[in-house]
Amino acid sequence: MAKILKDFRVVELGTYITGPAAGMHLADLGADVIKVERPGTGDPFRAFKGGLYSPHYQTYNRNKRSIALNTREPGDLKVFHDLVATADVFIQNFRPGVAEKVGAGEADLRKVNPSLVYCAITGFGASGPYRDRPVFDTVAQAASGYLRLLTPPNRPRVIGPAIADAVTGQYAALGICAALLERTKTGKGRRLDISMLEAMAHFNLDSFTHYFSVGEVMGPLSRPEVSQSYTFECSDGKWIAFHLSSPTKFWDGLVLALGHPEIGTDPRFAERMARIANQDALIDAMAPIFRERTREEWCARLGENEVPHSPAYDSNEALEDPQARHLGIQVTAEHPEMGSFTTVRAPYGFDGEPDTDVLPPPTLDEHGAQIRAELAARSKRAG
């Protein structure tokens, strides 16, 4: 695949997810992303079973290079500033004020690179009454109103992956790409501020729009009821999911697949608005029917009747599906020290060519000597 950002260099002073995720998206598009880490321990996400190559770290740090620098030490700070001088983008996800303490504030970096795109990711924002609060994923989900859309109402507990972290990283990468596009026309850099609160509020746009427009406060079942989305356990213990939306043909197809015409004529379910109002009853009616056949059998019946559906896979099944295998979503590469690395490729395909090339996440300071040599050569050429 074409490496769209191959001529851009990104210096990432990021930890955990938001900063590294932003860097990963740019690296997936071909940028030379150099991860600057603390000597000895590196990104805190590295730590795992006595080692420094955790699955969490691997998730967000492929296609990058690593250099270990203690920017509180004058020698390493100079290397860091020399590195930033070669960069197009700088990413950090510290609390406000911390970057300045380690020589990575915007003012310091503008002195060595005036055209830099400087991206600062925070939890609650660069200013305001909550600016100094520590924030992790669940806090941002909660503050943005999103957590309530995922929380089981009968037994409140946090479920699901780190959506706020991942979403913030995606928005940061999008903003960076926009700033780089502008810079190709103006030659000027930008400061990009993005908080997890703002990112998740935008991601939660549908919920806010419903409230602004009709005064409705959406809950975890609001969208599934209106969209007529369902998931059921089959006779083999595996799950299936389907989404009917509003076209009548999908409901009609479901009734045929079920083989229970009485469900289609039941006044509680015969019309879409009735199905929305009585979704719990409809679930109760369908659940025992789905337990009569295996998931494979139900997929065949729903497919024959053109009902939008899929097996509800676990992660050990999803990429073995024929369509996923056809698309080549799973890719593998070898790290000289850590061995085989398997991941999910970037979702982009430019000019019909998906990107199946991937570099394993670097070990701590894996490219330190290489990067220092590059900087020394650059300095020598400059005289």
Put a short name on every predicted segment.
Residues M1-F8, E233, E317-G383:
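Terminal low-complexity tails and localization/encapsulation signals of metabolic enzymes
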Residues A162-C177, M196-N204, S246, F250:
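Mid-domain beta-loop-alpha active-site segment that forms a flexible
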Residues M1-G175, A179-K185, T363, H367-G383:
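N-terminal helix-loop segment corresponding to the beta1-alpha1 unit
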Residues G303-A324:
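Conserved PLP cofactor-binding pocket of PLP-dependent enzymes
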Residues Q228-N305, H309:
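Aromatic-enriched alpha-helical interface/lid elements that frame and gate functional surfaces
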Residues A126, P153-I163, T184-E198, G219-P224, ...:
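Conserved Rossmann-fold dehydrogenase catalytic segment
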Residues G40, F124-G125, M196-A201, D236-K238, ...:
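Glycine-rich beta-alpha junction loops
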